[in-house]
Amino acid sequence: MQIEKFAKVIFDTDRTAKKASKIMEAVLKAKSPRISDVADQMAGNEAANYKMVQRFLKQEDLQEVLQRLFNEEAEFVIGDPTEIERPGAKKTGYVGTLSDGQTKGFWMLTLATPLRGRALPCHFVTYSSATINDEATSRNLEHQRAVQGIKALIGERTMVFDREFSYLGFLLKLDVEQIKYVIRLNQGSKPPKFYYDARQKRELKLKIALGEGPKIYRQIYYQGVLLVNVVGVWEEGFKSPLWIITNLEPEEGLRIYKLRSKIEVCFRDLKGLLHMDKVMNKSRTYLEKILALILITYAIALLVGEAIRDVRLARVEPNKVDLHNPPVTEKSSKWHSFSGLFLLLKRRRRLDARTLWQIIHAVFSIFFNLVFGKYV
């Protein structure tokens, strides 16, 4: 796949890029994040390969490299949490219990930018009940850490989160940092309260009828503390309404959330095809380094795979690949049935060498512009 060509764009030296590309190629072959599996897929002695991978992980700041994949043309940034189970890791320090209170594992919060219906990762943090003391307070701090990690990159862009993030402490942090946000409201067993006034004397009940157009509440107090805008819709076919909390204009917040809802988050392919949930590291430091490398590998493979999908299933000319806009296809087209990464890993050999070279050349141009901007 000529990963080295892409690696040279984001790594500081050609020598480092060469090492990284060998490891990333092996990750795709192994379809595994485990160093032993990766070393086995590399040419040469497996034991020597294993040590080389370990040295590489120790020496490189892969989180910094991952941030270079931030798409500056993105309108918004997505926060996407997932649970990674580690049922056998009883003595691993960073592993705690997941939301069911029993299963061993940890949380991974990934920040990503949208790219034609896909999520391109650019930052993440890991945390668990074992790495924090007070669950509510520390969860807030970990979520803040994720945002703080790329705050300079985010700039004026809006951050979009799901309902796990609609709690007061996190919203207050975003407000202090003057970050624009759109967050789905958690309407669980204990929904948050809203008030017309900061003294909490006049409570407001969110109400909307099925099929009713957007219901908007402007400048109301969330938990009686923070001024926010709230917008709700209840569309036919849904059991309950969708409520959005935002510091944007309500209509704009709803528009952005609807765009986000059409985007495939990255964890389905990361777990299903690259088996990221099988990651095994005793050290949290090495865990985060290998996860960063997996995300970098995924991002490059995603771009190439999406181009292959367009060429093979939508009959796009290889030199006319456009990863910013999806091709025009019938709803019955198989283009809608497969992800680009699936085609790259499972069906790449069906392309002739010339076509594959043209695809990679086109994708490299897109990748270069993604990293450095269009006008470099």
At which residue positions do the language-model features occur?
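Active-site-proximal, Lys/Arg-enriched surface segment
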Residues: A47-R116
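Single, function-defining residue in the core of a domain
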Residues: M1-R34, Q41, L57-E60, F70-E73, ...
